A protein has these predicted regions:
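Multi-pass alpha-helical transmembrane bundle typical of ion/small-solute transporters
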Residues: 1-242
Length: 242
């Protein structure tokens, strides 16, 4: 849906908190690098190239998280104690989340299955699911904190709707991490990985529902701000001839 009113950015420069967060994101991505050394043989080159797809998958996941984080600080520019605390926990979880994410990608690309013990899949999906849920629930908590500060931030009706959308979006995405770790311990462990594809469902429904609310709010705001057009003036009376 075309947006008639854009979300106002309250941050006009990069804060120390956001700069520090970017450094942590960059460090986390450096841990995903396929190899720190250039291949010295044809065999090493092939091994390095086999790691490109898992790296690309992990890189894409981190870009999604980084973009969500960047948009949050750009829009709200909140640097109070609760936001700093939530951001610190998020960065810690991301650093811990790096290696399970990388190993999960390698397993999915058939590079690490030989090293996976019989009960290893249960442990792997549990660790990955917890990390996945925590990342998106922490983002949801950060958006919820911004929504609690809506009066102080002077969020208009459209911005409040969009903030609630981000809360619900991150909450529902995080639920799939919990659903995955429950499935891997159920009689249907084979669906523990495929369940993540169902993220497309809330990613479709939530923007549709809140998009309609946003459109209605935009129309109300535009109607309220539109200048009143003067009504048709009464015709002047002609002087009477008598």
């Amino acid at each position: 849906m075309a947006r008639l009113i854009e979300f106002r950015n309250r941050a006009h420069e990069v804060s120390r908190l956001e700069a520090f967060s970017d450094v942590v994101f960059g460090f986390a991505m450096s841990l995903l690098v396929v190899s720190l050394e250039a291949p010295k043989s044809y065999h090493e080159l092939l091994e390095t190239l086999r790691g490109v797809l898992p790296f690309a998958f992990c890189f894409f996941i981190f870009i999604i998280i980084w973009f969500e984080h960047h948009a949050l600080f750009k829009r709200y520019a909140l640097h109070d104690t609760p936001m700093i605390a939530l951001n610190t926990v998020l960065l810690f979880v991301i650093l811990v989340y790096v290696y399970p994410l990388k190993y999960m990608a390698q397993v999915a690309m058939h590079r690490a299955r030989a090293d996976l013990p019989r009960d290893g899949a249960v442990v792997l999906f549990t660790i990955y699911g917890i990390g996945f849920a925590l990342v998106f629930w922490l983002l949801a908590a950060m958006y919820a904190h911004a929504y609690r500060r809506r009066e102080r931030l002077a969020l208009n009706e459209v911005e409040r709707i969009e903030t609630r959308e981000r809360i619900y979006d991150n909450l529902f995405v995080g639920l799939f991490g919990v659903l995955s770790l429950l499935l891997v311990r159920s009689p249907w462990p084979q669906f523990a990985g495929f369940v993540y594809f169902l993220i497309a469902v809330p990613k479709t429904i939530i923007p549709t529902v809140f998009g309609r609310k946003r459109t209605a709010a935009e129309r109300r705001m535009l109607a309220a701000s539109a200048p009143e057009l003067p009504g048709p003036s009464a015709p002047e009376e002609s002087p009477a001839h008598g």
